[in-house]
Amino acid sequence: MPWIQLRIDTDGPHADALSDQLMEEGSISITFEDGKDTPIYEPTLGETPLWNHTVIIALFEADHDLVPVVERLKLLPYLGENFSHKIEQVEDKDWEREWMDNFHPIKFGDRLWICPSWREIPDPTAVNVILDPGLAFGTGTHPTTALCLEWLDGLDYRNKDVIDFGCGSGILAVAALKLGAEKVTGVDIDYQAIEASKANAERNGVEDQLALYLPEDQPEGLIADILVANILAGPLRELAPLIAEKVKPGGQLALSGLLKEQADEVSAFYSQWFEMDAPAHKDDWSRLTGIRK
């Protein structure tokens, strides 16, 4: 079935209201895009992340008459008579297949591959984590996840256990187990993350070695030889004392989810507990590592 789409330029504060209006007009899907190539790095907790200049793309069936839709939108006070918009024909495609075609196995470090389940494993002798892209949690394509996976690939896991603090999809926890960790504990504030981590551990056959907790349920005195936290700079600062007490003396730490310009400040803050290394960078993002004093 062919489609048409209506692209509208708006500002962030009005994007949600406009999205609701377009759904009432019969749109079958709404997509938000950055209108000025301005990335969002750290939205306020509970806030819908939207750019100051947002492009809304509303998809309609091809026989939907968009002329009266546009006329009604002109009556909205935050759009007005001359709002910027474009109507486009959309090629009919197998969208699910196209989405799947965009994901390929990715290698991290010397040993580790992250492979979608529908792709052939490039190197059966390597350490392979099977993980399908999801809507909410990491799959290895984001620079911060990649930085953490590369670090994990280079560690010695003999007789060591790991904490994945903010486990999300469980990609880091599962990777550590496949790389040789004896036990991993994953902690996340989101119950959906716990469920996603559990499912990915089961898919990779390491569920018996992975313990998963919401913060309020984690065991007292939880401590490990290795801790990785791929969250954001704000929580990394706020939770620093808690994170530090979960790493054994001489244990290893990796922090990511922070921008290049945030790295030095966060590193200096953690230096009261850790001997910190120079930051590693990928694109605009950084990873910090250190050894517990």
From Swiss-Prot:
Sequence positions that bind S-adenosyl-L-methionine: 145, 166, 188, 230
Catalysis: reaction(s): L-lysyl-[protein] + 3 S-adenosyl-L-methionine = N(6),N(6),N(6)-trimethyl-L-lysyl-[protein] + 3 S-adenosyl-L-homocysteine + 3 H(+)
GO biological process: methylation
Main location: cytoplasm
Source domain of life: Bacteria
Location of the protein in the cell: Cytoplasm
InterPro entries: Ribosomal_L11_MeTrfase_PrmA, Ribosomal_PrmA_MeTrfase, SAM-dependent_MTases_sf
Molecular function per GO: protein-lysine N-methyltransferase activity
One Pfam family it belongs to: PrmA
Family named by the database record: Belongs to the methyltransferase superfamily. PrmA family.
Summary of the function given for this chain in its UniProt record: Methylates ribosomal protein L11.
Name of the protein: Ribosomal protein L11 methyltransferase
Lineage: Bacteria, Pseudomonadati, Pseudomonadota, Gammaproteobacteria, Alteromonadales
